[in-house]
Curated annotation (Swiss-Prot):
SMART domains: AP2Ec (SM00518). It comes from Haloarcula marismortui (strain ATCC 43049 / DSM 3752 / JCM 8966 / VKM B-1809). This is Probable endonuclease 4. Its cofactor is Zn(2+). Zn(2+) 3 binds at residues 176, 223, 225. The keyword Transport does not apply. InterPro entries: AP_endonuc_2, AP_endonuc_F2_Zn_BS, Xyl_isomerase-like_sf, Xyl_isomerase-like_TIM-brl. Pfam families: AP_endonuc_2 (PF01261). One of its GO terms (molecular function) is DNA-(apurinic or apyrimidinic site) endonuclease activity. PROSITE patterns: AP_NUCLEASE_F2_3, AP_NUCLEASE_F2_4. Endonuclease IV plays a role in DNA repair. It cleaves phosphodiester bonds at apurinic or apyrimidinic (AP) sites, generating a 3'-hydroxyl group and a 5'-terminal sugar phosphate.
Amino acid sequence: MVRVGAHTSIAGGVYNAVEEQVEYSGNCGQIFSHSPQVWQDPNIDDDEAEQFRDLAADHGVGPWVIHSSYLVNLCTPKDDLREKSLDSMQKEVDAAAKLGIEYVNVHLGAHTGAGVDGGLDNAASVLDDLDIPEGVTVLVESDAGSGTKLGGQFEHLATVRERTDQDIEFCLDTAHMFAAGYDLSTPEAVDETLAEFDEVVGVEDLACVHLNDSKHECGTNKDEHAHIGEGHIGEDGMRAFVNHDAIRDVPLVLETPTENGKSFAWNIERVKELRGE
C-alpha cells in the first residue's frame, strides 16, 4: 500500500493535523511546528503532544515530517543568521522528539556569495552543531536551484553528507528536481534521473518524497507546484515515478495547490489511481 499524505495544518492544536490527514484519506504527513515565515519557537505542550502521538497511532498515520522554517539558511556565511538557523533547527528536532515525529526536513539555503564549496561547508557545520535526539533524523531536501541556493544538484546533497558527522538522509521534491533540470516527464527520463540519484547519493538514504507536479518546464529553476499529472511532469511521468522500484516504499507527501476545485484529497486519490490502488 502506498504511503501518501499531505502537508496539513496545526491550527487549533497540533493534533488537528492528524484529523485533517484522515479527512484527506492520507496515511503519512507533514507539518510546520509554527509559522514558517517568522523566527518563532514551537508552542506545543505535553497534552497536545500526547494527543498527536495517540491519534497518529490510532489512525495508523505515519511517518510524519516537520518542515523547518523558510528563514533557516544552513549555507549562510553570516554569523547572526547561522546562529538563528541553528537555534531554530535545534528547536525543530526537539519538537519532533516530543511529538514522536521521525523526520525534520530542511533546505540547504543560499550561499549568498560564500561560493558553492563554502556554502556546503557552512551547512555541514550547522548540522554538526545540532544535538539531534534519538529517533529523529534530519532530511536535506533537493532544491530548484535558483540564484545562489544550493541543493539543486545531487552532488550538493552528497557533499553535505560527506562533510557532516550527522547521519542525515534526504527528501526529493519532484517539482524542485524538475526545475533544477532533472527530467521526470517520461518513463525513460524517470529511470535516468533516479539512476543518477542512486549513483551520486544512494536511494537507500531517500526517506521521503515531496510529490508535486510543476507549472514550469524542466530546467527553468522556477518552483511553482501543480496538481499531480496536470503540470509539465504530466501523467506519464508521475505514473512512472510513483511506480518506480526506488520510490514504491518511500512516503510521498503532497504540497500541491488548493485551486480549481482540487484539494489534497483529490491529489491523494490521484496518486492512488496512478499506483493502481
